[in-house]
């Protein structure tokens, strides 16, 4: 994949730092990157609210031939809501958890996303990044698992690992985040609250929208912007950890420090996307510590590049990049890293 800057491998990192711990990397970061600034946090809320309101006003008056780009733009602004809730889920939006929970639930509500289930599952992803036994975000099938799967599962997996990658987060959201029985104890109560909050709000809002706007109005003002959001949700999360050079590891060989530093891709997007999505693409520092607020990610990444730059993966968003990922990174073989479906069929 020519668009990825390939650094020395994780093996090289371990050879040079055989006793490397995540704490050793974190100790090189300035303490200021962890500082929570209420003014900056709420300024990002205001930016997203203004952007979403502006896009919906534009959507209301846009002629039919401009609907597609306006839907896409509106979905991008809604992704800003997700990133605000993302900070809340990592407790880096506010020092007060009740504020994080309140803002997180409200930010996720237009996306019909239960906050606590996402928070818990996403933190599990952070704890076990690129661990084949534990990671719940874009962990690839092995050839053996794929071969043993029912035909329907194979078809869905081929679709979301191919040209329909942008729908993967829809499946992830609906499959994992409404089932509170998959959680235990206090977490089950929290997830049930978040799921019911979304379900009850939807049970009120959707009939009102259908009654006042009609079917086309719901498609125009909710479904298409929501799919625009999921385009970015799927794209960001796929690119964060998926290039042929980045390995997944099984539990017995997994190293936390290597997974967080060299298992995450830094990808540059068009500036307007980065602004509206609050720098969610600056993902390496966020994986080293979830306590870094989104507005401090660039400062943190500058420090990481200075101290650990030779072990980072960097790329720039392009359709060539997405084509390469969706045509190559299908199944995971511990010996060869990713192989494509076509390569697997020839074996």
Swiss-Prot record:
Gene Ontology biological-process entries: unsaturated fatty acid biosynthetic process
Family, similarity comment: Belongs to the fatty acid desaturase type 2 family.
Reported function: Desaturase involved in fatty acid biosynthesis. Introduces a double bond at carbon 12 of oleoyl groups (18:1) attached to the sn-1 position of the glycerol moiety of membrane glycerolipids. Can also efficiently catalyze the desaturation of palmitoleic acid (16:1) in vitro.
GO molecular function terms noted in the UniProt entry: oxidoreductase activity
Enzyme class: oxidoreductase
Keyword Membrane: yes
Coiled-coil spans in chain: none
Protein name listed in UniProt: sn-1 oleoyl-lipid 12-desaturase
Positions of transmembrane segments: 41-63, 67-85, 98-118, 164-184, 196-216, 218-238
One cellular-component annotation, GO: membrane
Pathway the protein contributes to: Lipid metabolism; polyunsaturated fatty acid biosynthesis
Membrane topology: Multi-pass membrane protein
Subcellular compartments: Membrane
The UniProt record lists the keyword Transmembrane: yes
Motif (Histidine box-2): 122-126
Domain notes from UniProt: The histidine box domains are involved in binding the catalytic metal ions.
Catalytic function, reaction form: a 1-[(9Z)-octadecenoyl]-2-acyl-glycerolipid + 2 reduced [2Fe-2S]-[ferredoxin] + O2 + 2 H(+) = a 1-[(9Z,12Z)-octadecdienoyl]-2-acyl-glycerolipid + 2 oxidized [2Fe-2S]-[ferredoxin] + 2 H2O
Motif mapping: Histidine box-3: 286-290
Motif stretch (Histidine box-1): 86-90
Enzyme Commission number(s): 1.14.19.45
Keywords, alphabetical: Fatty acid biosynthesis, Fatty acid metabolism, Iron, Lipid biosynthesis, Lipid metabolism, Membrane, Oxidoreductase, Transmembrane, Transmembrane helix
One Pfam family here: FA_desaturase
Primary localization class, coarse: membrane
């Amino acid at each position: 994949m020519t668009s990825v800057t390939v650094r020395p491998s994780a093996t090289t990192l371990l050879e040079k730092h055989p006793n490397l711990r995540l704490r050793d990397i974190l100790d090189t970061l300035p303490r200021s990157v962890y500082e929570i600034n209420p003014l900056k946090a709420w300024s990002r809320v205001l930016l997203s609210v203004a952007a979403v309101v502006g896009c919906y006003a534009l959507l209301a008056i846009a002629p039919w031939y401009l609907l597609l780009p306006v839907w896409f733009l509106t979905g991008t602004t809604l992704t800003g809501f997700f990133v605000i809730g993302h900070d809340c889920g990592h407790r880096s939006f506010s020092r007060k958890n009740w504020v994080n929970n309140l803002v997180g639930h409200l930010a996720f509500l237009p996306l019909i996303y239960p906050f606590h289930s996402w928070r818990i599952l996403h933190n599990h992803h952070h704890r076990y990044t690129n661990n084949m036994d534990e990671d719940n975000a874009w962990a690839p099938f092995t050839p053996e698992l794929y071969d043993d799967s029912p035909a329907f599962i194979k078809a869905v997996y081929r679709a979301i690992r191919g040209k329909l990658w942008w729908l993967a987060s829809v499946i992830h959201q609906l499959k994992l985040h409404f089932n509170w029985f998959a959680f235990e104890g206090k977490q089950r109560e929290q997830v049930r609250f978040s799921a019911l909050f979304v379900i009850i709000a939807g049970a009120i809002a959707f009939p009102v929208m259908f009654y006042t706007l009609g079917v086309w109005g719901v498609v125009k003002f909710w479904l298409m912007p929501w799919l625009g959001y999921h385009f970015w949700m799927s794209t960001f999360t796929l690119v964060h950890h998926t290039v042929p050079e980045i390995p997944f590891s099984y539990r017995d060989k997994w190293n936390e420090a290597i997974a967080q530093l060299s298992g995450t891709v830094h990808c540059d997007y068009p500036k307007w996307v980065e602004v509206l999505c609050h720098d969610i693409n600056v993902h390496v520092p966020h994986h080293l510590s979830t306590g870094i607020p989104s507005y401090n990610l660039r400062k943190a990444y500058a420090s990481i590049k200075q101290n650990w730059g030779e072990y980072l993966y960097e790329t720039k968003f392009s359709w060539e990049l997405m084509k390469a990922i969706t045509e190559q990174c299908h199944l995971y073989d511990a010996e060869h890293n990713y192989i494509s479906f076509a390569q697997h069929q020839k074996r």
